[in-house]
Amino acid sequence: MCFNNIETGDEVETERQVFGSSEEDEFRVEDTARNTNNVQISQQQQQPLAHVVKWERYLPVRSLKVLLVENDDSTRHIVTALLKNCSYEVTAVPDVLEAWRILEDEKSCIDLVLTEVDMPVHSGTGLLSKIMSHKTLKNIPVIMMSSHDSMVLVFKCLSNGAVDFLVKPIRKNELKNLWQHVWRRCHSSSGSGSESGIHDKKSVKPESTQGSENDASISDEHRNESGSSGGLSNQDGGSDNGSGTQSSWTKRASDTKSTSPSNQFPDAPNKKGTYENGCAHVNRLKEAEDQKEQIGTGSQTGMSMSKKAEEPGDLEKNAKYSVQALERNNDDTLNRSSGNSQVESKAPSSNREDLQSLEQTLKKTREDRDYKVGDRSVLRHSNLSAFSKYNNGATSAKKAPEENVESCSPHDSPIAKLLGSSSSSDNPLKQQSSGSDRWAQREAALMKFRLKRKERCFEKKVRYHSRKKLAEQRPHVKGQFIRKRDDHKSGSEDN
């Protein structure tokens, strides 16, 4: 029994120890939580006040004082009531003189001026100019109002310094937004420097443009001085005259390329196988050489440049390029003439006589056609053909170059002396042989097409005549066909 009591006593003691330890732990947890809360509160109190947002900086604390200048009593009372409803402090004045007295009073503290433009004694624009010319009052925003909204008046008020222009009748929502002008003016004058930055930018831009213009003028003057100075300034040893001749040479070459239009056909070859364009090019080469010689006699440095330009290798290169250009022009003429003949084949002939004359002329051209050196592959038709009215301009253009054939002989040009006359005679023969084959094929196709068209038109014409005869045989009244009636039968029926 004693042993059992001892055991039960030990169990009770152990239970007490366990419960006591759990209670101590709970107290410790509560103490730690309180300590952490106290630390957080102390940290929040120790935070600097700079992070706190002050709305007083952005929102107006007090109501704005508005000075209303209006000579009409009813309008003045209405606008005053509207301003008071918008939580403004209003000082209404019927005259400009009284308004100026209030503005000069330091105790008034006017934040905004709302004035009428047209007034009997002193106008609102006079008050505006007077406020803008004052040292301290020019910071007060002035708003003009009027029943006239002409562009001239609005521009005059805004150019004199007005912040806004309101047109009567004035609405309440317009008056609610008047505080924004005061806020902008205070914000700009508080040190943000937005307006001053704009003015600085505007003033800097014209200075930069003037500087660029001055630099451009200085560079132009420097170029002119260098152009007027002697040839010793050039590093290559060439004179200004020599460079001028070289530039004139390149300019003339570009001018000759630009003056020949790509849409026009080149000149037709003459009987001697020379081209007018080639002669003109040769004449230009001669003129350029003469100018080089004249300039070369003037100065020693010019002589060096002219000698370089008159080297035989350069002349041979130029001659080769000119001959190649002439060959290309000849190829273009052949291709274009083939295109023109195809276009001409589509032109319809209206009468049988024209068709017959065309056939006769085509047969004659087959038999009597002579292919000469340098001739253009163009269909030769008589004046009675349908193509005569299209070829008048071409024939007149051909006659003009043939008058000056002798002046453009190949023996006069230095290019012909260097290259010989073989280059100008061999190429047209090859081109003409290929053009003759094309011409024969084209002529056969034209004949076939015209015969088919003739048969088709004849069938249509026969059909038309037969139907016309049948229609004439049928009598009709007012466009409607009727049956024939015998006069004898109708007379017997009447009796």
Curated annotation (Swiss-Prot):
InterPro entries for this protein: ARR-like, CCT_domain, CheY-like_superfamily, Sig_transdc_resp-reg_receiver
Domain CCT, first and last residues per copy: 442-484
Domain Response regulatory intervals: 65-183
Location relative to the cell: Nucleus
GO biological process, one term: phosphorelay signal transduction system
Protein modification: Phosphorylated by WNK1; during the night. Phosphorylation is required for optimal interaction with APRR1/TOC1.
Compositionally biased spans, kind Basic and acidic residues: 284-293, 307-319, 351-378, 483-495
Bias-annotated ranges (Low complexity): 231-248
Induction: Expressed with a circadian rhythm showing a peak in the evening.
Keyword list, A-Z: Biological rhythms, Coiled coil, Nucleus, Phosphoprotein, Transcription, Transcription regulation, Two-component regulatory system
Compositionally skewed regions (Polar residues) per UniProt: 206-217, 256-265, 294-304, 335-350, 380-395, 420-436
Major localization listed first in the record, in broad terms: nucleus
Region feature (Disordered): 188-441, 465-495
PANTHER family (alphabetical): TWO-COMPONENT RESPONSE REGULATOR, TWO-COMPONENT RESPONSE REGULATOR-LIKE APRR3
Protein family (similarity comment): Belongs to the ARR-like family.
Subunit structure: Interacts with APRR1/TOC1 (via N-terminus).
Primary role: Controls photoperiodic flowering response. Component of the circadian clock. Controls the degradation of APRR1/TOC1 by the SCF(ZTL) complex. Expression of several members of the ARR-like family is controlled by circadian rhythm. The particular coordinated sequential expression of APRR9, APRR7, APRR5, APRR3 and APPR1 result to circadian waves that may be at the basis of the endogenous circadian clock.
Protein name per the record: Two-component response regulator-like APRR3
Organism: Arabidopsis thaliana
Source taxonomy: Eukaryota, Viridiplantae, Streptophyta, Embryophyta, Tracheophyta
